[in-house]
């Protein structure tokens, strides 16, 4: 999957993956990470997610990474946030008091840009990658996240042959097999959410499961 795919989606505003409200699973499970209020939280492939506003409201310093510049600009403008922009070697750094977003490729994001990170939140990043690219993303996430950082991961799983992603199906088996090298994994919840997702119902997907994980970066 090439960057042009996502740029075209944002240019056409075909952004069905964007939620118009804070993710209820974030609200329900975030406190289980037991973070200090001033913790810095990394949000990969953040888009213009309102989840970042929720995290900032908890007192966190939010650090996002997003490929598409329009998505970043819309986040700040739609939330009436004044921002500064700094040009870096590989990214543009958009900044306001509690939310900083690096606009550019996550694979070229330097770990030196996030030395204070102690937590992360992935709702739409892991499931955005087809299987042949997903492991490379997981390895990059592990590279960026300091040891002992804690994170909340939300995944979707369904019969991949029944629907073309994104979002792509990520099974519990895949999570356990491919993330356990770098993270301690605890599945907090797993629910049938087919009836809540009309696109999947319309495409006659036979089942759809949403899972929530608590991850801790190994030392």
From Swiss-Prot:
Known EC number: 2.1.1.67
Superkingdom per UniProt: Bacteria
Family: Belongs to the class I-like SAM-binding methyltransferase superfamily. TPMT family.
Chemical reaction(s) catalysed: S-adenosyl-L-methionine + a thiopurine = S-adenosyl-L-homocysteine + a thiopurine S-methylether
Molecular-function annotations in GO: thiopurine S-methyltransferase activity
Binding site for S-adenosyl-L-methionine: 10, 45, 66, 123
InterPro entries according to UniProt: SAM-dependent_MTases_sf (IPR029063), Thiopur_S-MeTfrase_Se/Te_detox (IPR022474), Thiopurine_S-MeTrfase (IPR025835), TPMT (IPR008854)
Main location: cytoplasm
Protein name: Thiopurine S-methyltransferase
Gene from which this protein is expressed: tpm
One record GO biological process: response to metal ion
Enzyme class of the recorded protein, top EC level: transferase
Keyword list, A-Z: Cytoplasm, Methyltransferase, S-adenosyl-L-methionine, Transferase
Localization: Cytoplasm
GO CC annotation, single: cytoplasm
């Amino acid at each position: 999957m090439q960057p042009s795919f996502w740029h075209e989606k944002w240019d056409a505003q075909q952004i069905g993956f964007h939620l118009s409200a804070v993710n209820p699973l974030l609200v329900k499970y975030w406190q289980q990470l037991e973070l200090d209020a001033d913790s810095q939280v990394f949000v990969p492939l953040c888009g213009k997610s309102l989840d970042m506003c929720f995290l900032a409201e908890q007192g966190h310093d939010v650090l996002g990474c997003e490929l598409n510049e329009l998505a970043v600009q819309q986040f700040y403008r739609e939330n009436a946030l004044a921002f500064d922009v700094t040009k870096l070697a590989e990214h543009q750094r958009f900044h306001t008091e509690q939310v900083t977003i690096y606009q550019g490729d996550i694979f070229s994001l330097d770990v030196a840009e996030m030395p204070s990170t102690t937590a992360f939140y992935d709702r739409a990043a892991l499931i955005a990658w087809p299987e042949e690219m997903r492991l490379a993303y997981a390895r990059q996430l592990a590279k960026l996240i300091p040891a002992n950082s804690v994170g909340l991961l939300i995944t979707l799983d369904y019969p991949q042959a029944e629907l073309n992603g994104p979002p792509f199906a990520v099974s519990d088996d895949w999570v356990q097999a491919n993330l356990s090298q770098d993270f301690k994994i605890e599945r907090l919840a797993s629910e049938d959410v087919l009836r809540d997702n009309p696109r999947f119902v319309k495409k006659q997907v036979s089942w759809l499961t949403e899972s929530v994980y608590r991850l801790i970066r190994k030392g």
